[in-house]
Amino acid sequence: MKLTRNWLLVMSSFWMISNANAQFRKYSNEFLNIGAGAKGLAMGGAQTASAGDATAGYWNPAGLTEVKGNPVAAIMHAEYFAGIGKYDYAAMAMPIGDPTIATRTLGLSLIRFAVDDIPNTLFLVDPDGSVNYNNIRSFSSADYAFLLSYAQVIFGDESKTFSFGSNAKIIHRSVGSFAKAWGFGLDAGLQYRSKGFSFGLMAKDITTTFNVWNFNFSDREKEVLYLTKNEIPVQSTELTAPRLFIGAAYSSEISENLAIQGELNLDLTFDGKRNVLFRSNTLSMDPRLGVELGYKKLLYGRLGIFNFQQGLKDGDTTNLKKVWIFQPGLGVGFKLKQVDIDYAFTNLANQSNPLYTHVVSLRFNLKRKEN
């Protein structure tokens, strides 16, 4: 009952912040919303109810209690915007105590997103007004996140389980030598499983994750910023508003060799109206749908859609005609003994002018040594 009361208090904070959204940045720490693992990306990010491997630390930490027996790990690499942005992810989960029961599980996740070789044009123009391209230097922008996860079964038996999980996350962001930030936040999740059905709830940034930015400019850089009428920042705090994911999934065996799983997630934000399928001044809701077809638990095909948005129709010179667009996901998976190889083919733009990304990830079953 104490856990239930605490969870209700957490949920109430989502509605309280709707009256103070001026303090928050709508798109803060967006690198933490890219995803984890090619399986989840191929299914449109619909993983809140079904995640049950090392990637559950990202999608819903309550799902880590599904890791039984051996520790598991996952790694992923992806490149976005023709290789300009590089995204890396690694995670590990390990049962505590009796590994066959796994009522408690610990997880670790590392996330990095970076863009290198960004031109620094602060000194492009010499004092005499001439353009000197030799003055251009380059710098990198990198974002890091470290997630420590804990999950525990609240109650359960052979037919059903109800689990709770949480994340403590540390964030570090840097932009060349000019700006650096440290941040901290908490996530919490619930997951219920029973006879093919599963339900999940994931609350991200429940304590309004914060980043404290510090800026470091040389006297010469400050002079250029001043003369070009740019603001010279000293320190700032960036807040990320809470976000709620609700998911429901169902899995069934079609035949002796075929199985299917479908999941629907609702991504709820409380920081004002967003360009999503359902929106209001207080609440915005973006659906995510994913389907997986498995053959002999060895070969998998996956399909997903998410990120519904309304945009201007291509070729419309009046900028008045709007169409609904979405991001599709497509992927396959192979199981080879203790390793799962997953691939996803995703779209980062609208349907008529797509930016495609190929994502490959691996999941490992770290078999324990026998005595």
Question: Which role fits each region the language model picked out?
Answer:
Residues 23-371:
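Subset of outer-membrane beta-barrel
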